Amino acid sequence: STTNSTNEDVTATVTFDKEDVIVDGGNVHTFTENGEFTFRYIDSAGNTGTAIAKVTWIDKTLPKATITYSTTNPTNQDVMASISFDKEDVTITNNDGNNTYTFTENGQFEFEFVGPAGNRGTAIAKVNNIDKDVPVPTISYDITNPTNQNVTATITFNEENVTVKDGNTHVFEDSGEYTFEFEDRAGN
């Protein structure tokens, strides 16, 4: 069989330059994992011996993938997911072989990869922290009819966690305009 790194079983065969050699248990051994096997043999003259087969290149372990993100905080920007592995020579078989994927919106992407011994796997990158929508404000007034009293304007939003500069209320002592400045956690 092979002496290259593999995720398959390896077959070792012992051969001799004489035909009168008998191998106890047969001259073939299949390794399902790395290790050693001792072939015991005897020839027609009664000479005995051993031959040791050693295999160290079976790798049936899937490379461990780690996915990191450019940010996990709420953001109004794209998010880049990067994949890395605990083994060298791992090849990404989709995404044009790139180890990064850029999310322009929330969702998921499945990286597909193969390790140096041929072990194939997948890892899913998930993003749910992208918010590119500006919060929609609603302004309400405590008095809506003509009045000679102060009027309080209150701003509310269609989403939570919106910060309003100088607070979410403004008291009008006279007729006029006021601009509320606000930002959500993602920076919109």
Question: Positions of the model-derived regions?
Answer:
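Serine/threonine-rich, repeat-prone extracellular segments and beta-strand-based repeat modules
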Residues: 20-48, 90-117, 161-187
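Intrinsically disordered, low-complexity tandem-repeat regions
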Residues: 22, 80, 115, 136, ...
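Surface-exposed, proline-enriched loop/turn segments that connect beta strands in immunoglobulin-like
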Residues: 1-2, 25-26, 66-71, 96-98, ...
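Short, solvent-exposed loop/linker segments at the N-terminal edge
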Residues: 2-10, 69-79, 141-151
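Acidic, Ser/Thr
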Residues: 13-19, 72, 82-88, 144, ...
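Flexible, low-complexity linkers/stalks enriched in Thr/Pro that connect modular domains
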Residues: 1, 53-62, 125-135
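Extracellular/surface recognition and adhesion modules
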Residues: 14, 39, 63, 83, ...
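Extracellular fibronectin type III
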Residues: 49-50, 121
